[in-house]
Amino acid sequence: MGNNVVVLGTQWGDEGKGKIVDLLTERAKYVVRYQGGHNAGHTLVINGEKTVLHLIPSGILRENVTSIIGNGVVLSPSALMKEMKELEDRGIPVRERLLLSEACPLILDYHVALDNAREKARGAKAIGTTGRGIGPAYEDKVARRGLRVGDLFDKETFAEKLKEVMEYHNFQLVNYYKVEAVDYQKVLDDTMAVADILTSMVVDVSDLLDQARQRGDFVMFEGAQGTLLDIDHGTYPYVTSSNTTAGGVATGSGLGPRYVDYVLGILKAYSTRVGAGPFPTELFDETGEFLCKQGNEYGATTGRRRRTGWLDTVAVRRAVQLNSLSGFCLTKLDVLDGLKEVKLCVAYRMPDGREVTTTPLAADDWKGVEPIYETMPGWSESTFGVKDRSGLPQAALNYIKRIEELTGVPIDIISTGPDRTETMILRDPFDA
């Protein structure tokens, strides 16, 4: 039996993690975010009602679940307050269900200003960040000048630290990027206005998780973004600024690494990517447009159109290696309904003619990579909302089986629609 279950994306994000976390939290006592910030966009559809969460864990809608934001998350006070208000306006008692690590780095206005100034300065070489200050906040953390939630307990010292760090960043903004300085007093006033709310939710997360482990409580760890955007293992520099792989659970929450019992990789039935960076199977034809339209591939956070393409099992195998995956949840299978044929990328042809079955490491090494496809028959029958494996067309079952063969990982859950009920659980991670 797995008490500590990790749910993470195996591609470039947007795989459908939020729905699956929400579904599986029916049995969980805690749901923990361990990396990223409000650059994530987790969409839940429950009884036809749509909820988009960016920072708060997806378990917040469950009455008997405690949601935790771990130390690996960079926390924007303004984004958190906005999200809390939206949920509280719908009658959800967020403050009774949400806890924070005091070690969460804060994202403040100057981080956002830096993020946007840098992207503008990069011009055609822009990374495609969400412009929410995520990267600069992580930079401050590593440089040991970042302000954290715990600093809000001493307001006088916080004001002094803020003044010092803002002098440093405003110098860059004005003299290097040639943009306006960020107003110190406004940042201080805005942060102080919510300081007591934030500190009232602080808890020792590592100790709480260890106590939960000793009691045998079920805990779900909710990943954001996707494996191929990992700061160390992704398509650098076109990556996010945190560790999106399973290793980030231990460092981003304080759970001992030996206590991770099951890692569920969320795998979209095709590939998508937002922003710049390598994408060997990207489609620029009517099939790519079909996938975008049928899959409603627009970012929950930015509204940007996602790039679309065939499923890349070479890249997914890298995710299997990096995360020691226990099983997959295959999402958006229904988007492929109606295609005469479906393709799986099984290898790459490098510019020198070599065929390889592993991904390059740096973004520059992906240049000129051509996908080698295996083509399979598609299916005309609808898989939307199918809740039993026997109800799937044979061609869809063949597609599923081939993914399992190419990756060496079983598909334990199949999602056939956005609602939590439109799901087949073949093996429950908490029972594995």
Curated annotation (Swiss-Prot):
EC number: 6.3.4.4
Subcellular location: Cytoplasm
GO cellular component, one term: cytoplasm
Subunit field text: Homodimer.
This protein's name: Adenylosuccinate synthetase
Homology family: Belongs to the adenylosuccinate synthetase family.
Active site: D14 (proton acceptor), H42 (proton donor)
Cofactor(s) this protein cannot do without: Mg(2+)
One GO MF term attached to the UniProt entry: magnesium ion binding
Binding site for GTP: 13-19, 41-43, 306, 332-334, 415-417
UniProt cross-references to Pfam families, sorted A to Z: Adenylsucc_synt (PF00709)
Originating gene: purA
Presence of the UniProt keyword Disulfide bond in the record: no
Biological process annotations from GO: 'de novo' AMP biosynthetic process; IMP metabolic process
Highest rank taxon of the organism: Bacteria
Entry keyword set: Cytoplasm, GTP-binding, Ligase, Magnesium, Metal-binding, Nucleotide-binding, Purine biosynthesis
Binding site for IMP: D14, E15, G16, K17, N39, A40, G41, H42, T130, R144, Q225, T240, R304
Cofactor detail note: Binds 1 Mg(2+) ion per subunit.
Catalytic activity: IMP + L-aspartate + GTP = N(6)-(1,2-dicarboxyethyl)-AMP + GDP + phosphate + 2 H(+)
